[in-house]
Amino acid sequence: VVYTDCTESGQNLCLCEGSNVCGQGNKCILGSDGEKNQCVTGEGTPGPQSHNDGDFEEPEEYL
């Protein structure tokens, strides 16, 4: 299972199930095999801060 940190603003926003952006302090489980991303709370193992299919980045002009 891959976790990435989610923040309310910045370059590391995760679009998760229901098109919800994870709030600050939450983790995003990147979906695999057709599964949707899910927001979770609590501790997780952060994944590498790389450009993966499950990542979502806002263009800077919208920050």
Swiss-Prot record:
Cysteine pairs bridged by disulfides in the record: C6-C14, C16-C28, C22-C39
Key word Coiled coil present: no
UniProt keyword Glycoprotein, yes or no: yes
Positions of region (Interaction with fibrinogen-binding exosite of thrombin): 55-63
Record function comment: Hirudin is a potent thrombin-specific protease inhibitor. It forms a stable non-covalent complex with alpha-thrombin, thereby abolishing its ability to cleave fibrinogen.
Gene Ontology molecular functions: serine-type endopeptidase inhibitor activity
Keywords: Disulfide bond, Glycoprotein, Protease inhibitor, Secreted, Serine protease inhibitor, Sulfation
Sequence positions bearing Sulfotyrosine: Y62
A single cellular component GO annotation: extracellular region
Alphabetical list of InterPro entries matching this protein: Hirudin, Hirudin/antistatin, Prot_inh_hirudin
Region Disordered: start-end pairs: 39-63
Residues with glycosylation annotation: T45
Chain segments carrying region Interaction with thrombin active site: 1-3
Subcellular location: Secreted
Family recorded in the similarity comment: Belongs to the protease inhibitor I14 (hirudin) family.
Protein name per UniProt: Hirudin
The organism's place on the tree of life at top rank: Eukaryota
